[in-house]
């Protein structure tokens, strides 16, 4: 019993000295919360993203990325960069012009948080990236996340590791570079544009049209596009009207003319730039823009043509890297 009492006294003395020393553990030490990690810190410390981190540093967007909040980042792995460089005849990220590299990286960033787990029942989602066009307007470029046959970005990039949460947003790992969308990206991938895509395929100049729609814009080397994209129902109605009274030869000519009239290489006409009396030259005909009494924008190819309007006031256009899609309720003809 004496031994136990002695041990108890020694324990109390030891506890007293520990509590009075400067090295004691406080409640704050024991229950200290882990500081949430920023996306930029994660990218900079993970060996799977060394090339992505080098690209961020090389394009001078490090500070920009560090100050973004509530973002979605599709983070390309080293494999993604290696394949991209190989496909473009390069061996180093330094071979990509700095301004192009900055926009390519910003194309992986969306200014809102999107969880892949929330997209199980979503067929298509149009999202605005932080990349901008190289046109005078410098509008933000959109991407399409489709879930028709497995979730993909811009028609070809699957997500490898989804929904990694950080203090300033969410990261989804991808093993392919998400390239800037073109007009063809959306025409290929959007189900609501499938009839228009089929109409182009029926035209005599389908190959040229598709090549133009997917050509990357380079200032001085290619033209900005404005593409009038009719809804599926509008294309069906147009073809039904043709089949009702025309010969096969006339139908083919009408389809060629219709496709040409939806394509303009004149300028990237944003909705805010459309004004009463504006004439847009297309490959098929001049398209006149008018304002109705209720300030609705309408289009026509002549005094006896049908009046064409936007199919919805909620989504009137889609901006891509090489041009803009204006979403209409009828085929311009």
PLM regions and their residue ranges:
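Post-signal-peptide N-terminal segment of Sec-exported extracytoplasmic proteins
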Residues: 40-82
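Bacterial N-terminal signal peptides that target proteins for export
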Residues: 1-8
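Short domain-boundary/entry signatures in modular proteins, especially
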Residues: 37, 174-190
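Short active-site loop/helix that positions an aromatic residue
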Residues: 80-94, 233-248
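Aromatic/histidine-rich interaction motifs
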Residues: 86, 91-157, 248-313
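Bacterial Sec-dependent N-terminal signal peptides
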Residues: 10, 16-44, 325, 333
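FKBP-type peptidyl-prolyl cis-trans isomerase
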Residues: 74-84, 162-180, 228-234, 315-333
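Surface-exposed patches in mature extracellular/periplasmic domains of secreted proteins
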Residues: 60-68, 92-95, 207-219, 246-248
């Amino acid at each position: 019993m004496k031994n136990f009492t002695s041990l108890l006294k020694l324990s109390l003395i030891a506890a007293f000295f520990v509590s009075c020393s400067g090295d004691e553990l406080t409640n704050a030490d024991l229950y200290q919360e882990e500081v949430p990690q920023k996306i930029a810190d994660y990218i900079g410390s993970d060996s799977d993203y060394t090339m992505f981190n080098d690209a961020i540093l090389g394009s001078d967007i490090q500070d920009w990325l560090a100050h973004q909040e509530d973002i979605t980042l599709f983070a390309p792995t080293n494999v993604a960069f290696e394949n991209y460089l190989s496909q473009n005849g390069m061996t180093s990220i330094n071979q990509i012009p700095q301004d192009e590299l900055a926009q390519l990286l910003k194309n992986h960033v969306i200014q809102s948080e999107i969880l892949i787990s929330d997209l199980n029942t979503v067929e298509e989602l149009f999202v605005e990236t932080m990349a901008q066009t190289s046109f005078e307007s410098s509008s933000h470029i959109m991407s399409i996340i489709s879930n028709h046959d497995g979730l993909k970005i811009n028609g070809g990039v699957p997500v490898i590791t989804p929904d990694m949460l950080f203090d300033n947003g969410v990261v989804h790992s991808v093993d392919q570079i998400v390239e800037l969308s073109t007009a063809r990206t959306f025409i290929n991938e959007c189900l609501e544009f499938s009839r228009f895509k089929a109409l182009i395929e029926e035209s005599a100049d389908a190959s040229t049209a598709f090549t133009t729609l997917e050509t990357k814009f380079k200032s001085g080397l290619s033209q900005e596009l404005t593409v009038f994209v009719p809804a599926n129902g509008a294309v069906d109605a147009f073809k039904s009207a043709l089949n009702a009274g025309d010969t096969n030869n006339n139908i083919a000519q009408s389809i060629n003319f219709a496709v040409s009239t939806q394509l303009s290489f004149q300028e990237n006409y944003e909705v805010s730039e459309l004004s009463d009396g504006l004439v847009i030259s297309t490959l098929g005909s001049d398209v006149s823009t008018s304002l109705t009494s209720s300030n609705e924008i309408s289009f026509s190819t002549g005094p006896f043509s049908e009046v064409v309007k936007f199919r919805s006031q909620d989504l009137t256009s889609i901006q891509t890297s090489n041009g803009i899609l204006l979403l209409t309720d009828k085929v311009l003809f």
